[in-house]
Amino acid sequence: MPKKKEDSQKTLSEKEAKGLIAKLSDEIRHHQYLYYVKNDPKISDFDFDQLFRRLQDLEEEFPQFKDLASPTLVVGSDLDKDFEKFQHKLPVLSLINTYNDNELLEWVNKTDPEGLYSVEWKIDGASIVLYYENGILKNGVTRGSGGIGDDVTDNIRTIRNIPLRLPKPITVYLRGEVFMTFKDFEEFNALSSGKYANPRNLSAGSIKQKNSSDTAKRPLRIFTYDATFPNMEKKFKTHQEIFSKLEKLTFPVPPNTAFVSGSKIAKTIQEFKKQKDSLGFPTDGLVIKLNDISKRDALGYTSHSPRWARAYKFDAIMKESKIVDITYAVGRTGKITPRAEIEPISLAGTTVTFATLHNQDYIDELGVGIGAIVRVAKRGEIIPAVEEVVTPGKEVFKIPDRCPSCNTQTIKKESLVDLFCPNPDCPDRVKNGIIFYCQRKQMDIEGLGDKQIEFLYDHDYIKSIADLYDLKDQKEKLMEEEGFGEKSVNIILKGIEQSKQKDFRFLLPSLGLSELGHKVTELLIEHGIDSIDEILSIAKDQKKIESLLEIPGIGPSTIQAFQENFSDKRILKLIERLKKAGLKMKADPIQVADQQPFAGQSWCVTGSFENFQPRDKAMDLIVYYGGRKVSAVSSKTTHLLAGPGAGSKLEKANELGVSVYDEKQFLDLLKSLKIDFKNLI
């Protein structure tokens, strides 16, 4: 149990206190530099806050040693010498963090116990300030020191959900957070050989690219969460009014923001925690703000933060364990990733027995070895990772120089720290390539999970993606295998057959070719390169290949990969076999947005469904045909698709007069629109 402040500090002499304040100040500045400038934090938010609070307590106890450059008086800085500096028009402050309900409720009771508060997601991304003048985006600026930031306007303009022109010619300054969804991060990181640790680091690095065309290739998004309207005569009375105004101006805001009384904050926090794992974007907590603007003004600010808001950080998901072994996995690209087998720990609600070690450089930097006591965290809430060594093992682990799957000599690719297996026939590479092809977000072949694919490969049923389409010829033999009864085999074969109807825009990125993911595929299709014949024709003509550079979002690395992919005899043979199997080699035409059946409609989906598992499949279908996805029912929602377990969303939809469809009615609607949903989901 931690000591109370008076127990831990009053025993210090003035000389000791002065020295400790100086030491803590230097340590905090160092970690602020690593976090804000290098995007490479070495300690958790929780540990940083403990250092910060310790310094605050000491300065309160020994005010004679607090100087004007104390970290407690200034905001951490992300200033970079490579960008023009911009003087913020208002101070850009940070928030005081709280880590438990009691601490937060103590603040609420002291601030305004009966007042109304907003509870909104704290996005784990890169902080940005947007400056609009007369409705035009003039500047996008990092938080910087809080007074001066880096002008990254050209990079910010590439973010697709940031409006460059507003519906009205007004002047407004906005705070926002640039982020990347988990799905987009995984796809981008896969194309980048997994070199990025988490979405936050990638987002922060992306807005600091020297060339905005590089930023444009990255699937960045933004949520805005506060605004100042300097020239508006009518002042807003509440934060809720500001949020409403932001939405009317087409700014994206954090979903499901709640406005509740102080007495309901604890219950609301628990409700938010239940939603956290299904959000799809990184969050490290909640932000609680007093709703009444006049009360905010009365409370005011410290030099570091507003007195009317707090950040509620979720439990620090980092625990200690012992490394019992270190193994390494070979991915579909050949990248060899070491991972630590650890004594089981519970982390973020799951039992963790493995944690990634990324690469040899990472192992060397931390000094990781078998037998070490380490701290493990969920990095970006995706993959558990070893974060630091508490007690070293016997010796630092070295990855062998031969592939663990096929014994081929490993290589290092230019500018990458990872080791790769160069053998395209490496069993683990092939298996993981087939697993990738069958995943839901790729060709979505039902019944074929990792274990089934590994079995089929190891027992010589399949040795490539194309072999899947010959599996029907071995149906009788397969049904005799343990775990493969007639029912499960029929499901697998049906899934394989249905995949033949998947649009070419899914097929091409599912092949796992370097630099040819969903985003690049869509860019090609948008510019008329919508078939394999067109792609192969371009690949044979150097001038046509170079002309691809004219497409925004396609750069030299994509061009190089394009040439390499479509001159590779193995890939050409695979494409030819898939052609013969009957897969679609030309993209289906997409209707003009305002001609699509769900154009102009806002749909919310809730409950469970027989034909749409998971229910995201129903939403994907609606969006594919022009509808807009919303996560909560409001007066702007036009339709609700409700299955069993719909709960409060159904009640609210009925109250607001929103059109409600159950699954049967929705299927009838699809039928009337002549939408064959089974070939699309």
Swiss-Prot record:
Q: Which residues bind Zn(2+)?
A: C403, C406, C421, C426
The record's GO CC annotations read:
cytosol
Pfam families per UniProt: BRCT (PF00533), DNA_ligase_aden (PF01653), DNA_ligase_OB (PF03120), DNA_ligase_ZBD (PF03119), HHH_5 (PF14520), Nlig-Ia (PF22745)
Q: Name the GO terms of the biological process aspect.
A: DNA repair; DNA replication
Name the Gene Ontology molecular function terms of this record.
Answer: DNA ligase (NAD+) activity; metal ion binding
Q: Which Gene3D superfamilies is this protein grouped with? A: 5' to 3' exonuclease, C-terminal subdomain (1.10.150.20), 6.20.10.30, BRCT domain (3.40.50.10190), DNA ligase/mRNA capping enzyme (3.30.470.30), Helix hairpin bin (1.10.287.610), Nucleic acid-binding proteins (2.40.50.140)
Which SUPFAM superfamilies does its entry note? BRCT domain (SSF52113), DNA ligase/mRNA capping enzyme, catalytic domain (SSF56091), Nucleic acid-binding proteins (SSF50249), RuvA domain 2-like (SSF47781)
Task: Extract the InterPro entries matched here.
Answer: BRCT_dom, BRCT_dom_sf, DNA_ligase, DNAligase_adenylation, DNAligase_N, NA-bd_OB-fold, NAD_DNA_ligase_OB, RuvA_2-like
Q: Which cofactor does it need?
A: Mg(2+); Mn(2+)
Give residues annotated as binding NAD(+): D45, F46, D47, F48, D49, S94, L95, E120, R143, E177, K289, K313
Tell me the SMART domains matching this sequence. BRCT, LIGANc
Q: What is its EC number?
A: 6.5.1.2
Q: Give the protein's biological function.
A: DNA ligase that catalyzes the formation of phosphodiester linkages between 5'-phosphoryl and 3'-hydroxyl groups in double-stranded DNA using NAD as a coenzyme and as the energy source for the reaction. It is essential for DNA replication and repair of damaged DNA.
Under the heading PANTHER family, the entry gives: CHROMOSOME TRANSMISSION FIDELITY FACTOR 18, DNA LIGASE
The name of this protein is DNA ligase
User: From which organism does this entry originate?
Assistant: Leptospira interrogans serogroup Icterohaemorrhagiae serovar Lai (strain 56601)
